[in-house]
């Protein structure tokens, strides 16, 4: 009888684990890299979980809207939050960037859990008010589950997030904010399923373009 109970307990555990794996969303093939002054952070998207959110954020990335933006909030063990690009950037936006940045997306809430590395949209009380600000989870936050739209996760750069967690902070209202600006110097994107040679050439061009944006910004600032 004891062996039978052990057998059925093992089967039950296997079924539970199978369902847990099945519920984990699959990442799409697109990858985005934020180059910060503390290191790179790469992330991917969950198009099957939040398709409209993914489309919106990825378009902002492709337009270069996150370049010269920053992380306005770093709460150790909780979130590192990217500022809204309208008002968060140091560089002015062109008309196309501003048009996309001022859009909001519907709240695509899901059963995906808020755990470390997850990307989750920021918003106001209105569930459909998410725009361009989003958080990278620095720990488990079950109280956010089903309340904020999850659209992707960090795929590389956890060591950079850990650096951010150790930076000096100050408290302003409910927010824990870094004392010094954590800049997103530039950004680029690539596709892990693309043709290797062509994708590498395209990736190199985007990285060079992203670097040029930051170089030009510093040139204008330091050598007027």
Q: Which residues make up each language-model segment?
A:
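Cyclophilin-like peptidyl-prolyl cis-trans isomerases
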Residues: 17-224
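Bacterial N-terminal signal peptides
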Residues: 9-18
């Amino acid at each position: 009888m004891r062996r039978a109970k052990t057998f059925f307990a093992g089967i039950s555990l296997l079924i539970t684990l199978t369902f847990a794996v099945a519920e984990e969303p699959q990442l799409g093939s697109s990858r985005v890299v934020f180059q910060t002054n503390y290191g790179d952070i790469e992330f991917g998207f969950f198009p099957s979980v939040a398709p409209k959110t993914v489309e919106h954020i990825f378009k902002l990335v492709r337009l270069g809207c996150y370049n010269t933006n920053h992380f306005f909030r770093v709460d150790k063990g909780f979130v590192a939050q990217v500022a809204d690009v309208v008002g968060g950037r140091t560089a002015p936006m062109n008309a196309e960037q501003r048009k996309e940045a001022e859009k909001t997306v519907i709240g695509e809430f899901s059963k995906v859990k808020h755990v470390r590395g997850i990307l989750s949209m920021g918003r106001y009380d209105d569930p459909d008010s998410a725009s361009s600000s989003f958080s990278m989870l620095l720990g488990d936050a079950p109280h956010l589950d089903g309340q904020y739209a999850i659209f992707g996760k960090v795929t590389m750069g956890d060591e950079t997030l850990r650096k951010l967690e150790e930076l000096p902070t100050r408290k302003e209202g409910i927010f824990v904010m870094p004392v010094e600006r954590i800049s997103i110097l530039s950004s680029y994107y690539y596709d892990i399923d693309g043709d290797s040679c062509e994708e590498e050439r395209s990736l190199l061009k985007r990285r060079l373009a992203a670097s040029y944006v930051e170089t030009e910004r510093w040139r204008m600032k330091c050598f007027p």
